[in-house]
């Protein structure tokens, strides 16, 4: 475990004795004692980002947490600044994560949508329900209710999307090639229209990912609940924050 991962794990300790801390990993991996329980999955899911995404698009993953209403995904490049996880659970969103940017190089282009899955809160029952959907969306509902832009080019693109999602969520997730959080941010609502994704303003209060200084200013100089990718996204900024709150 790297020094940065130890920092992330130490921040997670603020939840100890308040919530169940459960790790998931392949077998024969030594897990830190901070965790209350470890769930093992096949090693094929831990080879790279793509295989990890495959696991988080599997029903069996969420069924392991069927006794919980929510799970907080906390990768070891995350930090949290408070223990108010219960507050976020009480907001009753199905999915909350740090907002994506419209352009990852130019934050001035603005935020896009929620959100990054590295530090994310997920409503277990709803995730299972979506992944067990047998049919794709109704064509006319998809066409007219999901398309604010009715231009020809947009329609052409959306027809292609519909052709794929009409095969059902099982086929779609098995053939999905992007990171799993993009499915939950962009596609899940097509299979379950009541899927409640937190709006941008709420997502920003929950977590930062890229361009933390920009996000901090946008969030009225207020820290969020946590952050993802802190050691990759202006590490100096985050180390100063950690020194201030841990003094």
Task: Please provide the spans of the model-predicted regions.
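N-terminal anchoring/stem segment of glycosyltransferases
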Residues: 1-53, 59-70
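Short beta-strand segments
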Residues: 23-24, 75, 97, 171-173
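Residues at the C-termini of beta-strands that transition into short coil/loop
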Residues: 25-27, 39-45, 97-100, 188, ...
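Short glycine-/acidic-enriched loop or helix-start segments at secondary-structure transitions
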Residues: 33, 82-85, 131
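Short, high-confidence coil segments that cap the C-terminus of an alpha-helix
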Residues: 68, 93, 192-194
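Short beta-strand-to-loop acidic/aromatic patch adjacent to the donor-nucleotide binding site
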Residues: 68-80
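Conserved donor-nucleotide/metal-binding helix-loop-beta segment in metal-dependent transferases, i.e.
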Residues: 78-112
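Catalytic core and acceptor-binding pocket of nucleotide-sugar-dependent glycosyltransferases
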Residues: 116-247
